[in-house]
Structures are given as C-alpha cells and as structure tokens.
A protein has these predicted regions:
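Surface-exposed loop/interface segments of Gram-negative outer-membrane beta-barrel transport/assembly proteins
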Residues: 1-61, 102-107, 113-217
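Outer-membrane beta-barrel transmembrane strands
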Residues: 71-89, 96-98, 200-226
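Outer-membrane beta-barrel pore proteins
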Residues: 49-108, 119-123
Length: 226
C-alpha cells in the first residue's frame, strides 16, 4: 500500500490525501488483477487510507510456498563389512546403501556400493591381490537456475502468501475439480513481476530431472620373488 501511495504522490494529479485514497482503492486490483481478494468480498479495500488494515479484516488464506516446495530431508545410511583370513590369505568384503532426501521437493540421492579385496600368498615366491568396487547411484534434482521462477528455494521464499497455491472461492474455501481434488492456481491474473502462469508445487512432480550412474573399478597385482 505504501509503495502504491508513494507512486501516486509523485504525480501532480494527487495530493497526499488523494494518493492515499487511490492506493486503498487500487491495492487489491494491483496485486491480484482479476484474482480472488485475500480478504474476501466484504473487504474490497482491506487497507484504509491510514495504511492500516480495516477493522475486522483478516486474510482468508496465507499460503506457505516454501513449505509446499520443501520436504523433510531424511538421511538413511547402512554399511556392512566382513573380513578375515589367515597368514597366507586375507579377504575383505563391504556393502553400503545411502538414501539422502534433499530439502527441495522431488530431490534426493541414492547409492548402492560393493567393494571386495582378496590378497593371497599362493606360493613361497608368488603372491597377488585383487580389488574390485562397484557403485550404482541415482540422483533426482529439480530444475534450477538463477531465475526466481526456476530456483525452488528462492521461489518459495519470494512468493507472497496472499497468492494462493490452490484456486480459492471468494469465501476462502478451495475450489475442487470433478474428482473432489484441489485445483492448482497458476496465477494467470498475477501482474508482471509476480510470476504469472507459474506454480512449482504443481509442476515439480511432473518435471523430473534424474541422473543414474554406474561406476566400476578393478585393480590387481602379482608379485614374484625370484
């Protein structure tokens, strides 16, 4: 409201009082375009000419975009190893599993790995060793860039709560589709600079970016004493 009032006050067409009045009249339209009034139809001007909320005005929703685009980053790691042998032969085997959920929605990393090492003194003059390892990893990561519309963390912290994640009725209830499910609000009514036609909580589960990688390595040696 204050920014809008100051914008009007710069014009010679307005006095400080009329600039404040015009800002109160235009606030909802400037922020929401043709979208729903966050304070309901009974408060077409939720902010008065003094810059304060009108008496009784309460937001019908306050969307938490960060919460909608983040998840609990649980980490599970399991490791198992076996080793043994005698004077002439020694062995070591290990296996591991890692599941690291990322903080951003649809992000995470999984890895399975195996490793083995066998050393043997085959004769009094010949000994050798073999070392093998294998790792299979899967990484999911949301599309990201410096743009506030593509960076999950930045977008969640930038988007104001008065823009709803789901389409809302004028009484603050959710609009539902024929199956009784909530309908994502892509904000076609949002003004320029407010990420119109955008809703990452809706598109991230469909816009998957995955990377799978297999790594194998082997080393061996023989040593003969002549």
């Amino acid at each position: 409201w204050e920014a809008l009032r100051n914008q009007y006050a710069k014009s010679s067409d307005y006095t400080p009082a009329t600039a404040a009045t015009q800002a109160s009249k235009d606030l909802v339209t400037k922020l929401m375009g043709g979208g729903p009034n966050p304070y309901g139809t009974q408060y077409p001007q939720p902010v008065g000419t003094d810059g304060k909320l009108a008496a009784g005005a309460r937001p019908l929703w306050n969307s938490d975009w960060s919460d909608a685009m983040e998840q609990q980053a649980l980490r599970t790691e399991l490791n198992l190893s076996v080793s043994g042998g005698g004077k002439a032969n020694q062995y070591f085997f290990s296996a591991g599993y890692l599941n690291d959920k990322g903080i951003a929605l649809e992000s995470g990393y999984q890895r399975f790995n195996l490793r083995s090492n066998v050393t043997s003194e085959m004769t009094s003059w010949l000994k050798g060793s073999i070392n093998l390892s294998f790792a299979h990893s899967m990484q999911n990561y949301p599309v990201s860039s410096d743009s506030k519309t593509s960076n999950v963390i930045t977008a969640g912290r930038t988007m104001p709560g008065f823009y709803p994640i789901y389409e809302m009725n004028t009484d603050g209830s959710y609009k539902l589709d024929d199956n009784g499910d909530r309908i994502y609000d892509f904000g076609s009514y949002r003004p320029s600079g407010s990420m119109a036609n955008w809703n990452l909580p809706a598109t991230l589960p469909l816009d998957k970016s995955e990377r799978m990688k297999d790594e194998f390595s082997g080393r061996t040696y023989l040593e003969a004493t002549i």
